[in-house]
């Protein structure tokens, strides 16, 4: 189901059973896999690939350009695995040329309200980040980190 107020680029790839709520914006080069739910007022942009069964809560900003002053517009990526939950006001930036061009989140993670994952981070499976926790660029979190 896609809400009529959602703005979705014809160049994005949306799989079956994806729910996109009111006032969401899905830009070109975004790929969203099956059974993901994007509740409302979420912006997903950049070269962002989202796996299956993820849930994005309102006012999340996913894939916008890095907050790295060295970033000069290079085409970097954000890759998100399966079964993750992104609560309200989560922000995630793609990679930069100084860190391999990829920010990656594996599976079964919980990002509580106001979390920020900066450029070139690598988040393994089963990670929990509590309210307003932030990661600077180039941070790696191993499995089961809370």
Per-region residue spans from a language model:
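Structural signal for interior beta-strand "rungs" in well-ordered beta-sheet cores
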Residues: 2-146
């Amino acid at each position: 189901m896609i809400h009529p107020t959602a703005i979705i680029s014809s160049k994005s790839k949306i799989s079956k059973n994806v729910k996109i709520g009111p006032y969401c914006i899905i830009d070109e080069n975004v790929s969203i896999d099956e059974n993901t739910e994007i509740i409302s007022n979420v912006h997903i942009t950049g070269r962002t690939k989202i796996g299956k069964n993820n849930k994005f809560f309102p006012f999340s900003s996913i894939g916008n350009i890095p907050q790295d002053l060295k970033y000069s517009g290079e085409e970097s990526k954000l890759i998100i695995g399966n079964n993750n939950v992104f609560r309200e006001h989560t922000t995630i930036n793609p990679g930069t040329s100084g860190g391999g061009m990829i920010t990656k989140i594996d599976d079964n993670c919980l990002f509580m309200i106001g979390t920020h994952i900066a450029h070139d981070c690598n988040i393994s499976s089963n990670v929990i980040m509590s309210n307003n926790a932030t990661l600077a660029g180039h941070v790696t979190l191993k499995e089961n980190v809370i």
